[in-house]
């Protein structure tokens, strides 16, 4: 009689792999590490995936964010051919750095409401970072051990995104919409790193009880702080002479 797979085992495998990959990186992780965390035999995992590399690529391709992920119909998951794997990785990582709100803002010569435009972009970036928090953590942890991934993620895509955001900030500075007393590259990096820390990195903080409010409140505070860092101060009312 064929053995049935537990219905939640695939989700457990994904959750555990994301956790172990984020801690050790893909290269340093063994399937036995994942199995040990799950409390199952290493051999049982090969009913679901042929290798840790296949599991890593599947996670990245699907952008496995928080939530329930259904197991594919065809198991075990197999590693695509090298050229296919590289193409899919480039496409998926590229989509993680595409923010439609930023591209729409960049296409405008001047905004009707600079504050509203900036807030829309900041919220869109925050939401994207939140959504891809776990797979992006795995990628950043694994990239130093994988030169091709490092070059794609850090040297190309991430660097291009920072430059694109800085170009938009500079354009708004020239138009008088953003404060112009700071270098646009520093302003952009400050805004983006603030978002990334609170939307993603703080969840891996060595002090998990940092005394912060709930996630929704944190998001609102970060949005307000980033807006305050980029928008010019409102003009002060003139004092009446007595």
Predicted features by range, described:
Residues 136-143, 202-206:
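Secondary-structure edge/capping motif, primarily at the C-terminal ends of alpha-helices
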Residues 20-67, 72-77:
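Helix-turn-helix
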Residues 79-102, 116-119, 123-131, 159, ...:
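C-terminal peripheral helix-coil segments that are non-catalytic and often amphipathic
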Residues 1-12:
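Short, Lys/Arg-enriched anionic-surface-contact patches
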Residues 60, 151-162:
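Amphipathic, non-transmembrane alpha-helical scaffold segments
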Residues 13-21, 125:
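Short hydrophobic clusters on alpha-helical segments that form packing/core surfaces
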């Amino acid at each position: 009689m064929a053995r049935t797979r537990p219905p939640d085992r695939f989700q457990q495998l994904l959750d555990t792999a994301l956790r172990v990959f984020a801690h050790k990186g893909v290269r340093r992780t063994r399937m036995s590490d994942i199995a040990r965390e799950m409390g199952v035999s290493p051999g049982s995992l090969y009913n679901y995936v042929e290798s840790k590399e296949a599991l890593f690529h599947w996670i990245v391709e699907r952008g496995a964010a928080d939530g329930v992920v259904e197991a594919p119909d065809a198991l075990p998951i197999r590693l695509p051919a090298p050229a296919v794997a590289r193409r899919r990785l480039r496409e998926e990582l590229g989509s993680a750095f595409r923010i439609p709100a930023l591209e729409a803002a960049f296409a405008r010569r001047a905004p009707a409401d600079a504050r509203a435009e900036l807030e829309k972009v900041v919220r869109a970036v925050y939401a994207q970072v939140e959504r891809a928090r776990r797979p992006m953590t795995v990628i950043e942890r694994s990239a130093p051990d994988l030169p091709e991934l490092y070059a794609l993620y850090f040297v190309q895509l991430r660097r291009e995104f920072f430059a694109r955001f800085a170009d938009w900030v500079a354009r708004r500075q020239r138009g008088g919409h953003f404060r112009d007393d700071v270098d646009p590259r520093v302003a952009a990096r400050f805004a983006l790193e603030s978002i990334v820390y609170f939307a993603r990195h703080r969840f891996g903080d060595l002090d998990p009880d940092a005394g912060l409010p709930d996630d929704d409140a944190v998001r609102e505070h970060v949005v307000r702080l980033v807006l305050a860092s980029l928008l010019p101060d409102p003009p002060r009312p003139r004092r009446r002479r007595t």
